Amino acid sequence: MKRTILFLASVMALSCAWGQNLSKNEAKSLEAFMNQPAAKGGNNGQALGYAGGGISNLPGITVSNGHVTEIKWNNKDLAGTLDLSGFPALQKVDISGNKISSLSVSGTPALIELNASKNRIASVAFEGCEQLQVLRLNRNRLAEIDLAGVP
């Protein structure tokens, strides 16, 4: 009986751990952003207080079934280019109040809400955002915006 319980507990723990593994594309993209210089020195990972332990342990992200579903990085002094292209389960993003200069959310079919206000965004890509309902881009450096890929 003890062996059976121990075995079941091990299987459950292992399945929970696997459930938090991030897809390679998403992990690579987030890791690249974490290594970029932050607005006030250091890098973006340091600005978020990321202490390592796997990219799925990044503060401010929610992971479900191996995919990022939500990012909440508002007012964190982040900077650089954030490429969230091809994040199929991403639904909500709040990166407001940073110094991000470029953003791509192309190929994020589940994206419902994007708040990227109060940044330095000069370019943003939206292709394939069929579910987008809330878009906040005020106080950026956009000269024009192509919303052809947005309903």
Cite the ranges covered by each PLM segment:
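Serine/proline-rich low-complexity intrinsically disordered segments, especially terminal tails, linkers
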Residues: 12, 17, 104-106, 119, ...
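Consensus "Asn ladder" position of solenoid repeat domains
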Residues: 76, 98, 116-119, 137-140
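Leucine-rich repeat
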Residues: 65, 85-90, 106-111, 127-132, ...
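Canonical leucine-rich repeat
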Residues: 71, 81-82, 103, 124, ...
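N-terminal capping/linker segments that flank leucine-rich repeat
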Residues: 2-83, 88-92
